[in-house]
Amino acid sequence: TIMMAGPMIICEGANVRHSAFLRGNVIIGAGAVVGNSCELKNALIFDEAQIPHFNYVGDSVLGYKAHMGAGAVTSNVKSDKSLVVVHAEDKDVATGFKKFGAILGDGVEVGCNQELL
């Protein structure tokens, strides 16, 4: 059984597996895999990205063929609840968000049980 709540686009050829929980604004690209017991919230998942098992991806972007190892998660709230600032190239950019997970580029590999802050 898959739980889906909220607006989403699941492209042709995407594979959403048993016990996945999709909520908020979610886009899953063609050929992407969202595995068993994974939760996605406000996530943009590009084509052929893999979130295969026991992952949480919130308020995040995963690039083409990015891969999250088993149990890897994105932390999307700062412990002090302040607004998130992203370092981009040579400057800091204020996002205006209290919640912002991770941006993974194309082909990025995240090891098992890693927490991306």
Model-derived features: positions:
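Structural signal for interior beta-strand "rungs" in well-ordered beta-sheet cores
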Residues: T1-L117
